[in-house]
């Protein structure tokens, strides 16, 4: 089964499975297509994180992350969210595809050639695809900004106007870049002629990234961080991602007997929100473990999490002035008939990344550099060669050694919040993926579209629950039902009897599909 936020990407992965490919091969095809069909959320100028597991007990995390440029500007103020100063981090997604392909061949008997897995993406870039409501929403949202973004209008508004929903949208320059990667391999992006064109385009745009920074970018295979949750094993990526925060939230909720708490009640939302607050108190310490020690055992120690749970007042909300950032990402997951599973996030950080399309490559570059701090006291302070704090944290749940639940979401700081809701609904309340994804969600804190430091609840939460939460001291702000602000998530559940259920979020354009045979 495949779940992704775009039907064409889901279909590309399904076709690989139908042709005998494994979950990793299908995921590469999905990831490539989605860089074309969801340019507002991700691209080959961004990053990727994969959680990988199979029935044999093998489990890994593939960290396709960039690093800060060797020659950085002297930042006096916060790093900008757009423009050349935000393009200070290289891009790891493409390298992760080839590393995933090698892993598939080495461990899962993969037979598909790397170039073949990019065919569908190249076709949609070259010949076009029907533009979606989601892409137009985010284009409209930034309509007052795009004139200042180099090469943006000519790439995403090629006729000098806003496209119409369903209109065919092609990206010929991106198609040429993808063809070069397919022909020469992923390192073409980092060391070949394409890399030289990328470096020239970045320099022309005013970015500090150079050909040397591209050449130094390599994804790494690491071990996931884990937490026991009611006899199941939750997996998350290690720092510099916020995966540890998701596990901490679940570890705090583990201290409460949710069988006595009605799903969707005021008690349910209150516990989830307060667990998020407690877990996020440690989050500012997350940084690149290559440069800053990360005491994971302390952060996930049962006693530490139990004390956080004990500090939650059931009748009163903790005060919460906390700066959040938000961003846009795509989540997709694949499981196959062999018991192999992958859970993946790809991202350019904010919607439309830095806003800069690099030269004639068609590549929209990420603004992940804006995730760094300029405060010298911060563990996440910007430094040459350092990886910034990453919001990306796909999730996987194991039952015994075998993959049981794959899930993840778009939404930057909202990701651990949405994951806590999804995981409790799937694991504690045994909802199927469609129901778990469709029910109301919340988002705590400021976002780029709402600077109120409030608890945002979807309008589908009933009035009595909203009133109860307000009485407990939560500062409530309503957002529309099925709002994209609450994340665009996906989930697959693999049952013991072989039944597989999957869905993608009704807040987006995607779907889940599986072969009928």
Q: Where in this protein do the model-derived segments appear?
A:
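M16/insulysin-pitrilysin zinc metalloprotease superfamily fold
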Residues: 147, 243-259, 397-400, 404-405, ...
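Short, small/polar residue-rich loop motifs at catalytic or cofactor-binding pockets
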Residues: 221, 326-329, 390-392
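Glycine-rich phosphate/pyrophosphate-binding beta-alpha loops
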Residues: 235-243, 329-333, 343-357, 408-416
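Short beta-strand scaffold segments in enzyme catalytic cores
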Residues: 42, 47-54, 330-334, 394-396, ...
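Extended C-terminal subregions enriched in glycine
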Residues: 338, 386, 419, 428-484
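Internal maturation/activation junctions in enzymes
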Residues: 255-348, 360-361, 368
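Noncatalytic scaffold domains of N-terminal-nucleophile
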Residues: 1-11, 15, 21-185, 189-191, ...
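Active-site rim segments in enzyme catalytic domains, especially the processed small/beta chain
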Residues: 24, 36-53, 58-60, 208-210, ...
